Every structure is written in structure tokens, then in C-alpha cells.
Regions:
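Small/aliphatic-rich secondary-structure junction motif
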Residues: 2-56, 85, 102, 133
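Short glycine-/small-residue-rich Rossmann-like dinucleotide-binding loops
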Residues: 9, 74, 114
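Structural beta-alpha unit
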Residues: 13, 27, 75-109, 145-147
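General small-molecule cofactor/ligand-binding pocket signal
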Residues: 33-35, 87-91, 139-141
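Short secondary-structure boundary segments
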Residues: 36, 112-114, 142-143
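A short acidic, glycine-rich active-site loop
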Residues: 53-68
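Glycine-rich, Arg-bearing micro-motifs that act as flexible, cationic patches
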Residues: 108-132, 147
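Short, acidic/small-residue loops that bind anionic groups at enzyme active sites
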Residues: 133-143
Length: 147
């Protein structure tokens, strides 16, 4: 079965990309992986007294929050439609690295374009990095699903 990986960050652009991917997967008989990458913030260490941190608890909390975000997006976009298997996945990694890693096992990588124009390109957008370095074809979805 073909696999389509979609980058999810909670934005309208990523929701529209997921809508497109789900419809494409329905036509092609593919499965969809909705992938959200997150980075855990590093606690600031200073010289003053501090409350002990529950690092394992924080790790779990960040993961659960990330998984909740991508699951909520999948629920919003797909709803109760059972025609396509959509798996929400959260990974601790930078978005670019997570998507590039996932592209190695995918038939298509779909990312939304936030439309930042030239400034986004100069700063190195995730979409641009994926288009240049992914191991599979990349579709950069611009605009709404009707476009």
C-alpha cells in the first residue's frame, strides 16, 4: 500500500495539505501519516535555587501535547470518514529532519505552504528543505483545497 506523509503544525496550511492528501489517498488507495514534529524546550539553568524538575513527566507532557495537536487536526479534517486510514504521529525532532526522515519510507511527502514568499526562502523554510532533500516526491500545497 502506498504511503503519503503530511507535515502537520496546526496551521490552516497544514490542514489544507492534509485535506488534499486524504482525497488523493482515497483515489490511490493509499494510507496517510499525519506527522507532527516537536522540540522539547531545554530548561534554563541558573545559579539560583530552583524547584527540582520532573524531566520524565515533562517529556511525557510534551509528547502527549504534540500527539493531541496532530490527533485534533486529523479529527477536524477527516472526521468520521473511514475511507482512508490516517495515522496521527508525533515525533521529537525538528520539523525538517522529521519530514526528511519520514520521506525515506513514503511514496509522497505533502507539506503546506505558509506563503512567506522570498523572506521565507531566505530564512530556509521547511517546504524548501523538503523539496530539495526528500527521498520521495514532494507536493507543496498552496492555498485552500479548492485551488
Amino acid at each position: 500500500m502506498e504511503k503519503i506523509v503530511v507535515g502537520i503544525d496546526g496551521s490552516e496550511a497544514s490542514k489544507n495539505a492534509l485535506r488534499w492528501a486524504v482525497e488523493d489517498a482515497r483515489v490511490r488507495g493509499a494510507e496517510v501519516i499525519a506527522l507532527h514534529a516537536y522540540e522539547e524546550p531545554m530548561p534554563a539553568l541558573d545559579a539560583g535555587p530552583a524547584t527540582p524538575l520532573d524531566l520524565p513527566g515533562l517529556v511525557t507532557e510534551f509528547y502527549e501535547g504534540a500527539l493531541r495537536l496532530v490527533s485534533d487536526v486529523v479529527d477536524e479534517v477527516v472526521g468520521n470518514a473511514v475511507t482512508v486510514n490516517v495515522a496521527p504521529i508525533a515525533v521529537e525532532e525538528t520539523p525538517t529532519k522529521a519530514l526528511l526522515d519520514a520521506s525515506r519510507d513514503a511514496d509522497l511527502l505533502v507539506v503546506g505552504s505558509h506563503g512567506h514568499g522570498l523572506s521565507g526562502l531566505l530564512l530556509g523554510s521547511v517546504s524548501l528543505e523538503c523539496a530539495q532533500h526528500a527521498a520521495c516526491p514532494v507536493l507543496i500545497h498552496r492555498g485552500s483545497t479548492s485551488q
